[in-house]
Curated annotation (Swiss-Prot):
Leftover remarks: Plants expressing an RTS antisense construct display interruption of tapetal development, resulting in deformed non-viable pollen.
Residue pairs linked by disulfide bridges in the UniProt entry: none
Gene Ontology process terms (BP): anther wall tapetum development; anther wall tapetum formation; pollen development
The organism of origin for this protein: Oryza sativa subsp. indica (Rice)
Name of the protein in its database record: Anther-specific protein RTS
Keyword hit for Signal: yes
Length: 94
């Protein structure tokens, strides 16, 4: 269960990073140069840091084994939801 949750979280981060990479490069200008939107990259990087902290909080949550096993899926789902909202906010705020 924990490995599935961790794999799902990694997949979400990979999807967010791929979306950011796809949107980070602006189309070429008149001089043919492609300029990278540094603000978007910085925003998505911040989302990655937040989700990492969130997931570490899920795994280090304390409590008994039964309580941790019950709470873990909900914690990971919350982190996943948060990172998707964060990444979406990055693309709309620039």
């Amino acid at each position: 269960m924990v490995r599935v949750a961790a794999a799902a979280a990694v997949l979400v981060l990979a999807a967010a990073a791929a979306a950011a990479a796809a949107m980070a490069a602006e189309p070429p200008t008149d001089d043919g140069a492609v300029r990278v939107a540094a603000g978007l990259t910085k925003c998505v990087s911040g989302c990655g840091s937040k989700v990492t902290s969130c997931l570490l909080g899920c795994y280090g949550g304390g409590g008994g084994a039964a309580a941790a096993a019950t709470a873990m899926p909900f914690c990971v789902i919350g982190c996943t939801s948060d990172v998707l909202s964060c990444a979406t906010g990055c693309s709309t705020s620039l």
